[in-house]
Amino acid sequence: LPNYHTRCKMKKGILAVSFGTSHIDTMEKTIDVLEKEFAKTFEEAVVYRAFTSNMIIKKLKRTANIKVQTVGEALEKMAADGIEEVIVQPTHVINGIENDRMLQEVMEHMHLFRKVYVGKPLLSSVEDYKKAIHAVMEKTVIGEDEMLVLMGHGTDHHANSAYPTLEYTFHSLGYQQVLVGTVESFPDLRNVMAKLEISGRKKVVLM
């Protein structure tokens, strides 16, 4: 998040933007945790939630009667609540389609507020990659005969380059027992399987 501890007396709000999930248990372990951390760190701000996936928003309403707002709806609610200064923080991993969609909605609603700040996705700079990698490896134990495989969704957006870049950075930092794959793009599962075969390792830790 950008520096948000200011002396300004304007009413502040943080909009946490996620792709979303229809699995309540997963939401409690991920999105809920992040939003609570935002609220704890920035006590002077009110935290709001928005999802970018309309499919997930509709499914949550249909199956669990849970109403989650779109980015535009949440911004309109914040304005109605008297919020004047907004920080929009995505929980997205890459600067892909969902992040572009979020930015478009923010642009369309900026006139509702005196100040609007927009944070970046997880992997936005070289240092971001390094910090993310070290954070993962600090919590992960890999045996000599094992390979850690990280799987992402993948996209036809040019931001998909983040996935092979992530694998390259793992290796450049000395973590040779790590591969990165995607479900719907490159590197695909066949690429990952080929590298696993070359490595000779028979056990995989999937993350």
Predicted ranges, named:
Residues 4-207:
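Active-site-proximal alpha-helix that buttresses catalytic centers in soluble enzyme cores
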